[in-house]
């Protein structure tokens, strides 16, 4: 089954002053407020960037290969949760835990956050390879960011090519506007990390990529990308 991922992108170039604010704000809250004001003043909006068609088998492999979540059949768990969002009724006599009606206005269960994270990380890996045209070098475990990729076309160019530092956030059945707010709160951390990485490797370009994945249905996702450049 093909999955359609609608893309929106936002470019966020940082000046040297803004990069310094991001690094300093990791330990000084006053600088964090200055950084937030500087970013808000840029008025950069998300722009439509087309859509990706990804086969479910490809996404499942990407989840298995690049997610740090120990979740058996993450896609299956998402599908099960979404199936209960339709008008669906169990036979009388079942325990209340298994009785659900979307009309009641009360949701007594929630989707597995680990499954959402796993699927989102798999989507992030697909985007890094197919949208950014990068090769994945490393998947840090229990560390930041989620994925590191290179724009190198061959092995001989790895030491000088552009590096992509990708962090992925995910949610299920929430609005795109809510994800935009989440990314606005998270972009500071990625900006600080990207600026610090650039100081350590001044000879190559660093690009921080913050991805927000929204799972609407089993075959329709949205992905918001903020690209931090220096």
Enumerate the predicted regions with their spans:
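Conserved alpha/beta core surface patches that mediate binding of polyanionic ligands
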Residues: 140-152
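N-terminal alpha-helical "arm" segments
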Residues: 1-46
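Conserved catalytic cores of phosphodiester-cleaving nucleases, focusing on short active-site segments
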Residues: 147-149, 156-174
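Interdomain/boundary linker segments immediately adjacent to catalytic/signaling cores
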Residues: 41-118
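Acidic-basic catalytic patches of nuclease active cores, encompassing PD-(D/E)XK
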Residues: 101-141, 195-203
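Eukaryote-skewed repeat-based solenoidal scaffolds used as protein-protein interaction platforms
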Residues: 129, 146-149, 167, 181-184
């Amino acid at each position: 089954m093909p999955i359609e991922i609608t893309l929106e992108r936002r470019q966020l170039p940082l000046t040297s002053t803004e990069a310094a604010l991001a690094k300093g704000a990791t330990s000084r809250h006053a600088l964090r407020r200055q950084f937030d004001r500087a970013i808000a003043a840029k008025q950069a909006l998300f722009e439509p960037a087309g859509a990706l068609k990804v086969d479910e088998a490809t996404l499942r492999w990407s989840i298995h290969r690049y997610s740090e979540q120990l979740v058996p059949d993450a896609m299956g768990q998402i599908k099960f949760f979404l199936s209960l969002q339709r008008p669906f009724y169990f036979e009388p006599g079942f325990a209340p835990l298994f009785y659900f009606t979307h009309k009641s206005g009360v949701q007594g269960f929630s989707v597995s956050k680990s499954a959402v994270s796993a699927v989102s990380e798999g989507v992030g890996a697909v985007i890094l390879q197919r949208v950014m045209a990068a090769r994945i070098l490393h998947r840090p475990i229990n560390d930041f960011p989620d994925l590191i990729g290179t724009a190198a076309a061959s092995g001989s160019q790895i030491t000088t090519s552009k590096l992509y530092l990708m962090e992925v956030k995910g949610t299920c059945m929430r609005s795109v506007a809510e994800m935009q707010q989440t990314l606005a709160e998270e972009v500071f951390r990625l900006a600080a990390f990207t600026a610090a990485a650039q100081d350590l490797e001044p000879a190559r370009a660093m690009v921080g990529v913050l991805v927000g994945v929204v799972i609407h249905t089993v075959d329709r996702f949205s992905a918001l990308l903020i690209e931090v450049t220096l």
